[in-house]
Regions:
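Core segments of cupin and vicinal oxygen chelate
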Residues: 14-53
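Conserved beta-strand in the GNAT
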Residues: 55-57, 121
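Exposed loop/turn and edge beta-strand positions of beta-sandwich/beta-sheet ligand-binding modules
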Residues: 7, 40, 50, 72, ...
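Histidine-centered active-site/metal-ligand motif
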Residues: 10, 54-55, 75, 109
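Mid-chain, well-packed structural core segment of small domains
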Residues: 69, 75-88
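Vicinal oxygen chelate
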Residues: 1-4, 87-132
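N-terminal beta-strand motif that seeds the catalytic metal site of vicinal oxygen chelate
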Residues: 1-19, 73-78, 128-132
Length: 132
């Protein structure tokens, strides 16, 4: 059997806060709301570059339960660039975040939460950046 699983394609959030969630990913993380197939339920696809990395299901008007956080998933990690600029941007936007350096490495992480309390980890390989 010649089979292998590749990289993460996307993650999905079910929310009653569709507009607020899309706005967070656009304004705070610099992603963009983009094309989405005409499913029979409302939602949005949020893109990083040309790839829809976040699918959002709008569960308003349904009896589906709004989960208070990521459930059994602890967090979602995304590769990022511009460590210092990101820290400054988050501070300017008033977004609570914490910074961590991965031991014995040049990798830094910034952790923050979206409007649905999903924890987002941004990973920066700072050896490729001018200053940290």
């Amino acid at each position: 059997m010649d089979m292998r699983v590749g990289q993460l394609d996307h993650y999905n959030i079910s929310t009653r806060k569709l507009k607020e969630t899309v706005q967070f990913y656009e304004d705070v993380l610099g992603m963009r709301n983009g094309p989405r197939p005409p499913f029979n339920f409302p939602g949005a696809w949020v893109y990083s570059g040309d790839h829809p990395v976040l699918h959002i299901n709008d569960i308003s008007g349904t009896d589906k339960e709004q989960r208070p956080d990521s459930g059994v998933i602890d967090h979602v990690a995304l590769g990022a660039r511009g460590f210092e600029a990101t820290k400054k941007h988050l501070t300017t936007k008033g977004v609570a975040h914490r910074v961590n350096q991965v031991p014995n490495s040049t990798r830094w992480q910034i952790f923050l939460r979206d409007p649905n309390n999903v924890e987002i980890e941004l990973n920066f390989e700072t050896k490729n950046e001018v200053a940290v």
